[in-house]
């Protein structure tokens, strides 16, 4: 499925129509999902191309109470589709987040927010090294998800930016098969189409901004085939 953020409910409707024709399901997001939650959910909840609702990326604990209200409102209307909230990695500054450690951050989220699945992003390959807290992050996330009886999803990085290099096939395999080894039941890529951003210098994603395939597309395709 595709995680898709669009500018309006009408754009979401068009995207779902295209997705249905191509056999892709979308995790949708648009401003109205927040400002007009009930009518927006009712409009799309029976669409066969809908996978779920994207609510927030990398929330802090101060966001948890409002997110819990939002999740419950959506699930009251549509219990058949999941709400998606992607959590921070353990290299975020936990002191600034107001928690004792990363496990505390994950536990607080699980205790307060009744989502069906858990997900986090962690991009381990930086230049020619690997962050040394990566497997600890996977261990904590896997352990807390298992204790809560929830599935978890995890990422691999496919789009180079800042100090993150263009991924090699070996890097993609390392990330995805490590996710699987720790029990991930959903595998995610950041990103498919290369985002436009001068701040992050995104480049060489699987699909360029003008819609052309790069060598990363073929690498991602091969790893998917192996999985």
Predicted feature locations:
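Glycan-processing catalytic domains of CAZymes
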Residues: 1-227
């Amino acid at each position: 499925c595709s995680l898709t953020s669009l500018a309006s409910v009408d754009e979401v409707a068009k995207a779902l129509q295209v997705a249905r024709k191509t056999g892709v399901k979308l995790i949708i997001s648009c401003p109205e999902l927040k400002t007009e939650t009930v009518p927006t959910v009712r409009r799309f909840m029976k669409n066969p191309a809908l996978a779920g609702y994207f609510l927030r990326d990398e929330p802090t604990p101060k966001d948890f109470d409002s997110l819990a209200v939002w999740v419950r409102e959506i699930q009251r209307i549509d219990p058949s589709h999941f709400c998606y909230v992607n959590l921070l990695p353990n290299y975020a500054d936990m002191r600034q987040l107001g928690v004792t450690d990363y496990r505390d951050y994950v536990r607080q989220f699980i205790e307060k927010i009744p989502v069906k699945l858990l997900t986090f992003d962690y991009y381990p390959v930086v230049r020619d090294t690997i962050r040394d807290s990566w497997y600890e992050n996977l261990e904590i996330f896997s352990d807390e998800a298992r204790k809560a009886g929830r599935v978890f999803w995890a990422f691999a990085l496919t789009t180079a930016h800042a100090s993150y290099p263009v991924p090699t096939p070996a890097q993609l395999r390392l990330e995805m098969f490590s996710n699987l080894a720790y029990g991930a039941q959903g595998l995610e890529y950041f990103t498919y189409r290369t985002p436009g951003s001068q701040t992050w210098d995104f480049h060489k994603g699987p699909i360029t901004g003008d819609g052309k395939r790069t060598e990363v597309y073929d690498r991602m395709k091969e790893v998917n085939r192996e999985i």
